[in-house]
Amino acid sequence: MVRRVFLLAATALLAACAQAPAAPEGTLSTKDLHWLNTVSFGADQASIARLKAVGRQRYLEEQLKQPVADPPELAGMIAALPIATQDGPTRFAALRAARQRVNALPDGDEKQQARESLNKDGREVVLDASRRHLLRALYSPSQLREQMTWFWLNHFNVYANKGQVRWMLPEYEERAIRPHVFGRFRDLVMATVTAPAMLDYLDNAQSAANRVNENYARELMELHTLGVSGGASGSRYTQQDVQELARVLTGVGLNLRGEPPKLNPQRAALYRADGLFEFNPARHDFGGKTLLGVRIPSGGAQAGFAEVEQAVAVLSRDPATARFISRKLAEYFVADSPPPALVDRMVATFTRTDGDIGAVLTTMFLAPEFDRVLASGSRKFKDPMVFVVSSMRLAYDGRQVTNLRPVVNWLNQLGEPLYGHVAPDGYPSSEGAWASSGQMVRRFEIARAIGSGPAGLFAGDDGKPTARRGFPVANSRMFYDTIERTLGPSTRAALAQAESQAEWNTVLLSSPEWMQR
């Protein structure tokens, strides 16, 4: 059967798609379906019904106004995760105590086992953070918020296996990213500047007036705000600007001690702390600085952490930042090479609204240039996250899985594990990064795993089923109302030859049309 399904899927993958037939009266148009697949991680019956009822503009407004809080059923699932029971300081207090116990043990097997147990606890924190992220991507009605959370996690990337980052991941996504995905870009940047995971990952926690570390300053300018100097965003900055920003950021670090530092009384009032984050004035360079031609005062009310806030405002309001962020959003949602006129519209909105992300998204999703892209049949190629989540949302629409470990493993196999990108640039979103023959073979295998049965998705930690499993049925009423007409003749012919539901599911989820939004 495996060989037969592979041949059917390969036939569809190698064939060119014919123009989709018109939508039957009363159903969602093909353009609207592709629009919805872009705004969400993948259409389901509920989102299709809502878009049909209210139209694009109202649907988008509702998505942008969805509360940050999860709906009750989803909130209950997330509350059951172990990471929900501890905040950062509590987790690190327990970690300090555990490390002290391990260090007190004599060298030998017991000490080694205790270390391995502690490492396992750290891996479980990462797994729980991944589960929480995937639960929301799969089941939250706030699909645009979840997509933007994924987008900004990539943009402000941290790597779980660097330093202490794994222990800080839960708060990074929950406090630094999710609350700000539709807000002012400046506030989002500021939240990441004070995020312990970011400060540990990019080494700013080690930076002090007498030993400045430029790593975070460089990435904050090049990857998070302005773009590469001299690049497409039009940014122009020098190594001197990087050094000045690094001086501004001295003292921005971590407090993993569990108690505040002892400070000179003259500087004590400048100390700030929030959870594991601290601004320690004893480590800050109070000399005058100039960033991108803007003078940053060295004394009075503007000294200390106020310098950091001013620097973030300077970076966030620079014209290069407006273009860099607008183009990156358009590259993720619209096309690898988005229409220049669309990017210009987004830049104008970003500038006019002082970086209002929600307003920029509204401009993008409702722009005539985007509508023309949809009408042309050109669609974004799915990265592994979108491929896996959209496949799950179709195959198990309305059914709650209890074990997300297989989904986590599928993303690992496809090369896009959550919190697993080593470099600070995050995962790419272009087709060229994800369309290799090896990637396609792995996608076929995962399509078969999703389409052939529950694949452990309804099992508990002991491997035993915890709920009525149900078989995935991708050819639902939603398929016939919306998806079928988007398929080319070769894919439809391959589906007609399928000899079982599992084979049919696998062919659909392996088809060239399904690889695009």
Residue ranges with predicted function:
Residues 1-7, 36:
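N-terminal export leaders
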Residues 7, 18-21:
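Short, low-structural-confidence N-terminal segments
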Residues 10, 52-55, 192, 364-365, ...:
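A general structural motif at alpha-helix termini
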Residues 14-16:
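C-terminal motif of bacterial Sec signal peptides marking the signal peptidase cleavage site
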Residues 20-28, 33-47, 79-82, 318, ...:
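Flexible, low-complexity segments enriched for small/polar residues
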Residues 71, 141, 145, 159-163, ...:
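Amphipathic alpha-helical interaction segments
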